[in-house]
Amino acid sequence: MKKILLLLFVTTFSFAQEFQGKAYYFSKTIFNDKIKVEDTGVNKDIDPAMEKAFQEALKKASEKNYLLTFNKSECIYEQEQQLEKPKSVAGEMSISVSFSSSEGKKYINAKDKTSSTEDEIFGKEFLIVEPIEKPNWELVDESKKIGDYTCFKAKLLVPVSEKQKKEYEEFLKKEEIKPSLFKMEEPKDKTITAWYTPEIPVSFGPNNYLGLPGLILEINEPELIILCSKVVLNTKGA
């Protein structure tokens, strides 16, 4: 299953060598309120050294690297493999925080208007294929430089989905019966800000964002930032 998306993409690329590239992204989660060790229910009598170690581990766990491989009509987005964490020296404090396992590859075909995502459910691997719709981006008359590229701003309003509303309602019902240690915030509409460059004429970007007149180099969500650190292009034969 893990080879399916790669095979789809490589096969197509063999017929579309005129323009392709790779964009490397770095993402990090933004924490609105400082999360403390005692919030996890571990121990309320925490010394400053452990609190500092926890904050550093939390920061590292929220940072991930991704690779977007693309041509003019397709792209594949995947999380890069993380290096094994070095073992702590004897006597040093070490805290590890993990949010989730490695994410599956995401493949988009702009011609077919479909997206394919690898996912694992109950230990079995699945390939989920869904139709894609072009987001209703609002282009903003504002620009800035990201590396060597001139980028332009765009905004996207993402309303709360019915699924999110239902999940929150179910959480509230469970809270009435048995309060949970972890709280769920009420979902709200959110505004996504993107920075794209027409200098790279593809309509793709990180994390399934697409539909702008140029490669997306930066995404700002309320609690997540995705930045492009490097772009490698191969336009031989164009």
Label every PLM stretch briefly.
Residues 18-238:
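Extended soluble regions of mature proteins
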Residues 1-25:
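Bacterial Sec-dependent N-terminal signal peptides
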